[in-house]
Amino acid sequence: MQIFPAIDLKNGQCVRLFQGDFSKKTVVNEDPIAQAKAFATDGATYLHIVDLDGALEGRPINLEIIQRMKKAAKIPVQVGGGIRSMAQVDYYLESGIDRVIIGSAALTDPDFLRAAVQKYGAKIVAGIDAKNGFVATRGWLDVSQVSYLDLAKRMEKVGVETIIYTDISRDGTLTGPNLEQMANLKEHVKVSLIASGGVSSRADLEALAQLGLYGAIAGKALYNHDISMSDIVEVEQIAY
């Protein structure tokens, strides 16, 4: 299973949120470039970067910093946050970013998602963020009436190969991932699934790996030292 250390960017710093609440923000490193390099040095093979400023503004804000992070880390990066037009997708991918995550627009503008997948294939990842099973958009500020499973099925139909699923109620809480929802997704869609939200321990990563998922994202637990990079490297190499 591929495990992605997460770096969330706000005002040029690495931060963690609690349940996606921008008022409950903790700065975990003032230097995101050093953080990216440290993760890579300790064995990370792929980084998950979210431009929180971009998610709020609806346009990429931190591309220059992200480019410098990738250059320092020398490993692939996937980036999300405010990517809502083909021009923005082009902007990221032409600048050397490996994959882009389309979140809100996957629900609000399915034609854009379809066009992006047709143009870039596996470089497009769909992000589904849900609260109590219903999809949230616009930096998690708005909650729709669309269920996470219905949206995942729509994503599969338009050709999306990889979906990141975030349970907002668990994000940044260290209460464990939503194994039930991940298992439900695994049963009903045949895309590569990445779990996000709530990972608190090596045991959580092992439980996700046992579901047969493609990947998992580790954030707060890494910064709190509840999970080490050596844990991540070891779990990635276990065959379930």
UniProtKB/Swiss-Prot annotation:
Domain of life according to the entry: Bacteria
Signal peptide residues on this chain, from the entry's feature table: none
Pathway: Amino-acid biosynthesis; L-histidine biosynthesis; L-histidine from 5-phospho-alpha-D-ribose 1-diphosphate: step 4/9
Reaction(s) the record says it catalyses: 1-(5-phospho-beta-D-ribosyl)-5-[(5-phospho-beta-D-ribosylamino)methylideneamino]imidazole-4-carboxamide = 5-[(5-phospho-1-deoxy-D-ribulos-1-ylimino)methylamino]-1-(5-phospho-beta-D-ribosyl)imidazole-4-carboxamide
GO cellular component annotations of the record: cytoplasm
Subcellular localization: Cytoplasm
Family assignment from sequence similarity: Belongs to the HisA/HisF family.
Protein name listed in UniProt: 1-(5-phosphoribosyl)-5-[(5-phosphoribosylamino)methylideneamino] imidazole-4-carboxamide isomerase
Taxonomic source organism: Listeria monocytogenes serotype 4b (strain CLIP80459)
